[in-house]
Amino acid sequence: MGKEKVHINIVVIGHVDSGKSTTTGHLIYKLGGIDKRVIERFEKEAAEMNKRSFKYAWVLDKLKAERERGITIDIALWKFETTKYYCTVIDAPGHRDFIKNMITGTSQADCAVLIIDSTTGGFEAGISKDGQTREHALLAFTLGVKQMICCCNKMDATTPKYSKARYDEIVKEVSSYLKKVGYNPDKIPFVPISGFEGDNMIERSTNLDWYKGPTLLEALDQIQEPKRPSDKPLRLPLQDVYKIGGIGTVPVGRVETGILKPGMVVTFGPTGLTTEVKSVEMHHEALQEALPGDNVGFNVKNVAVKDLKRGIVASNSKDDPAKEAANFTSQVIIMNHPGQIGNGYAPVLDCHTSHIAVKFAEILTKIDRRSGKELEKEPKFLKNGDAGFVKMIPTKPMVVETFSAYPPLGRFAVRDMRQTVAVGVIKSVEKKDPSGAKVTKSAAKKGGK
């Protein structure tokens, strides 16, 4: 057995008709763990419905439909393998909740694959003011997705077909936009592909022999290996809490940073409740240590289920334990709010697993969202497209961290009127010291608080 491949998460972004589903479907289809029988079934159904052209996207549509109906889809279907990596595709963003998911992040993407429609009119629609190409790229950068691959898709449908001139034009325009967002376009491969015909997806295409760079598969292999934050202090936001007969209270969540081990004394923020971890399990197997990215359940001593809930964060009591945030200052980008946002605005913040109303106590500055330069001190309001620094006060106890120290706990979506109105990253946090929090006997014995 060779060394196991590294897992990476990829988010596929781009305008609605750019061919995201077809391209992703193609990769999963050719490189993924989809059972041949399943594919044959899909193909047969697609043929019966005269959807031949939709073959790859159809695979993805079927998966999405099954997932949305709550059929537990074998998540291997959203995975594919390159020579170097196991890749998982994070929610493809046709989804209304995509932005929220990308931020509250069931997983942080290591690389964004930006799909561009190269056809006449298609490219212009995607990159226009209202197109999603810009918004997705800006979001990816703001949320810390540092690496990007650009695919100039539908090269089989340019005029003339496989046009180098069209490719050059797109590379030039997209590069200048990505540079404004904050990416370095010299570090981004621009791969001309056809997600439908398969040109340059996996093998080199003779139709594009003027192009000398990597295929999409090779570009994915050139992604820099992500550093997992296991050396940081523990942060594990709870997703759920169960009471299991004969075992007791079992909180469940994903280790975002640090390491969780049996015998560790953990402090839950914002309450300050401190106790010992008896055991840690993943997929019904006992673990000696859980690392970032692991979804685990862990059993805690002498803690009632009612004392824990979703949004609470487990941390190591001896290593920068999680505390309640009295207030925090964030850099916010207003994305889709119909009016003006002024001091006193109180929407809901989705940050890690918590979902709490927060007051915009004070808009400190308005800034240029690309350069970060200050445009105005203490503006009266922010509106669509504006960015600014805002001091926020939670309406209930909550744990947040700075984006620089603990990225998954330092980015958030602002929700109002059933949509994401803004996104942000946290720059500084003023924390409260817990007073009178319960410390269980076993924790006290171990020299906890």
UniProtKB/Swiss-Prot annotation:
Main location, first listed in the record: cytoplasm
InterPro entries xref list: EFTu-like_2, G_TR_CS, GTP-eEF1A_C, P-loop_NTPase, T_Tr_GTP-bd_dom, TRAFAC_GTPase_members, Transl_B-barrel_sf, Transl_elong_EF1A/Init_IF2_C
Domain tr-type G per the UniProt entry, residue ranges: 5-230
Keyword Nucleotide-binding: yes
Ranges for region G1: 14-21
CC per GO annotation: cytoplasm
Binding annotation for GTP: 14-21, 91-95, 153-156
Residues that bear 5-glutamyl glycerylphosphorylethanolamine: E289, E362
Modified residues (N6-methyllysine): K261
Residues the record lists as N6,N6,N6-trimethyllysine modifications: K79, K187, K306, K396
Presence of the UniProt keyword tRNA processing in the record: no
Chain residue ranges for the region called G2: 70-74
Places the protein is found: Cytoplasm
Residues with PTM N6,N6-dimethyllysine: K55
Region (G4): 153-156
GO molecular function: GTP binding; GTPase activity; translation elongation factor activity
Region (G5): 194-196
UniProt cross-references to PANTHER family, sorted A to Z: TRANSLATION FACTOR (PTHR23115)
Family: Belongs to the TRAFAC class translation factor GTPase superfamily. Classic translation factor GTPase family. EF-Tu/EF-1A subfamily.
Role, per record: This protein promotes the GTP-dependent binding of aminoacyl-tRNA to the A-site of ribosomes during protein biosynthesis.
Descriptive protein name: Elongation factor 1-alpha
Gene for this chain: EF1
